[in-house]
């Protein structure tokens, strides 16, 4: 417990400083850059050219009429330690002249959280783009939160959807009204269209101001789609749970844990229209279907009365129908080659609204039914085929929860031998490829039937994540991996249940398609994310989740003649409310003939996403070496291009490594990406590698950056206000420090956040007072280590502040991830040697050290060494 209001723990005496001195001229330049970075940190999304904050950062070139971002050159060696505050800054502003916006407002251009371009100034020609070696792509996230109600966008419900007759793009804030407002010119293809009747009227026929319409004022808008945008009636949301009931799942507690979690969250499944339906199939060497009758106490609602046209006798008949004594029934199907449905599908896929109580009863019974099982089989392939047959008329989500490698029936897998293959050129082809073609062909069928597959794999054994992840990759789903799961561990159970709960309660869209339309001369040519590429530019999602991100590569096929170019992302989908909607997001970007302007407007975080997606593709389709080589060569090309096009006149170009300030974090991120568990050299179990690659494919940008360059907080010396609520009630977080062990004091306390886990590093020589305040013990050997949680110490304000900080980091409404906390004791000269516990601690320490990516990690170069190798390479 704390013995006084505030302790002062030992403080570092010598701050971490750059290892190379900064001369006066460099200091002046550094001050300029820092001032700019500070201004950027306070920018609001505002496209008006006379915005004060933008004018503070941008410059206008004589005669151009355009406001562009300034280029600030820096020597990367004088930027050590790297200024990591840049990683949390918003992107460079996009400045669009008011003359090019129908109704200028801060919502005229799409917020970067929805669509973020790698370039804020687009080269007018492909040759200029090639010269800069910078990629042109957009990062897309159609929905920002797990629940749609957390962030609603303007909705048009009048049925007036104005589209260009030539390119089929939607009206947006950048069109031009001509001919006294009777026509409008498309900003994407320049075609002149008629303004439709009803555009200037409301639903009652009264005149309205067209300049107040949502699509004119907002770059992100939803439309309530009329019937012509649907090929059939909006289907209900359907969930089929495939539960592994083999010995493994029973012994490690996954079956009981998952059944209880589904039970506790069944009422939180999206059911806005009251039509959500559920089926449960248990799987071992057979398929076990369940017939779930209507609840005995179900009463007909007013809505049901209306459906029966208010006829009292119909109501009586309905009450008679539901007042029955039917019981839950289980049907065992042992024929895995030709599995058949034991009864009609509409009796196995039951309405949640009418069967909730009986579903809860079934979920309570399932662990009891299979508690004495002796079956070690798991027939996933036949179960998937059965599930698709069950919901082929509606589509929906198949939720697979398993602890066992599929080992019988179609899609049967065997453990792959990793010995002698890990960390060799054969690793990708022999360990990370899809082992059975069933998992590829089945996803094609899923897309035809509008079915998504999500995997929750929790086991202490090999699961062939590389193969099973194909199910989610091409159906709009996801694979979640819980290695070493055991329900006897409260921390394992907490992580699994939190993530499954968030996943089940997440809003979804069904029958979704996404397309990007570009200005003449531009075309989307590469597509990354979990979906099915149905045609050259149409991405199909059986269901669209809310926690994934996508990236589209853009090519310049013809010269761009206009001052601005446009990219419009449209998504057609069906909500759980039963509504068919269209979400339209329009991005306007200035064009440029200057390499200097293009470099000055490049977005280092979006570029990192582009590099990541391409590296993951190469890792899966070629080799780990080709993925790392792609990262290295891409960065070398950018540095070479900058040297040639921008800094050739600099007399210090041979002794320095120059880049613009807005890209100064890119080398650090590329170095970190090469050290990520998904891509780094060394022996990494294939399930871990495949899971990490799968996560990189879909991670929203801010989490992706954190997984590449983890956030590190120093806690023992945090200011008084940190860990306490601010004026908005949010817990104040410490300022991050650089991810390097050189900043760690032997007596310090540090928290590391890599977006997937949290690590609490306790210095081996931490003072007893600190240990008492955090763990209620003055002996470091007595603190909990490994996967754990901080103890609740009501008498310790410091302990409460730490728990608040951890809680704030875990408090996210845009991801299902719950970060487990690992407590690690740092080395000390007094610690015992050769104990098993110390060997375990050594592996934990190695794991933590691998997150400190500025250092030399597992034979990967430190950041300084990485820069030196880059300088040597481009000066050859």
Swiss-Prot record:
Q: Which GO terms describe its molecular function?
A: signal sequence binding; SNARE binding; zinc ion binding
Region entry Disordered, spans: 300-326
Q: Where is the composition biased (Acidic residues)?
A: 300-324
Q: Where in the cell is it found?
A: Cytoplasm; Golgi apparatus membrane; Endoplasmic reticulum membrane
GO terms, biological process: COPII-coated vesicle cargo loading; intracellular protein transport
Cross-referenced Pfam families: Gelsolin, Sec23_BS, Sec23_helical, Sec23_trunk, zf-Sec23_Sec24
Q: Which GO terms describe its cellular component?
A: COPII vesicle coat; endoplasmic reticulum exit site; endoplasmic reticulum membrane; Golgi membrane
Q: What Gene3D superfamilies does this protein map onto?
A: beta-sandwich domain of Sec23/24, Sec23/Sec24 helical domain, Severin, von Willebrand factor, type A domain, Zn-finger domain of Sec23/24
Q: What is its main location?
A: cytoplasm
Check the record and name the InterPro entries matching this protein: ADF-H/Gelsolin-like_dom_sf, Gelsolin-like_dom, Gelsolin-like_dom_sf, Sec23/24_helical_dom, Sec23/24_helical_dom_sf, Sec23/24_trunk_dom, Sec23_24_beta_S, SEC23_SEC24_subfamily
**What segment(s) does the record annotate as region Zinc finger-like?**
164-189
Q: Where are its TM segments located? A: none
* Keywords per UniProt: Cytoplasm, Endoplasmic reticulum, ER-Golgi transport, Golgi apparatus, Membrane, Phosphoprotein, Protein transport, Transport
Q: Which residues carry this modification: Phosphoserine?
A: 51
Also noted in the record is: Present with 1720 molecules/cell in log phase SD medium.
Subunit structure comment from the entry? COPII is composed of at least five proteins: the SEC23/24 complex, the SEC13/31 complex and SAR1. Interacts with GRH1.
Known role: Component of the COPII coat, that covers ER-derived vesicles involved in transport from the endoplasmic reticulum to the Golgi apparatus. COPII acts in the cytoplasm to promote the transport of secretory, plasma membrane, and vacuolar proteins from the endoplasmic reticulum to the Golgi complex.
Name the protein family: Belongs to the SEC23/SEC24 family. SEC24 subfamily.
Designated name of the protein: SED5-binding protein 2
Give the gene that encodes this protein: SFB2
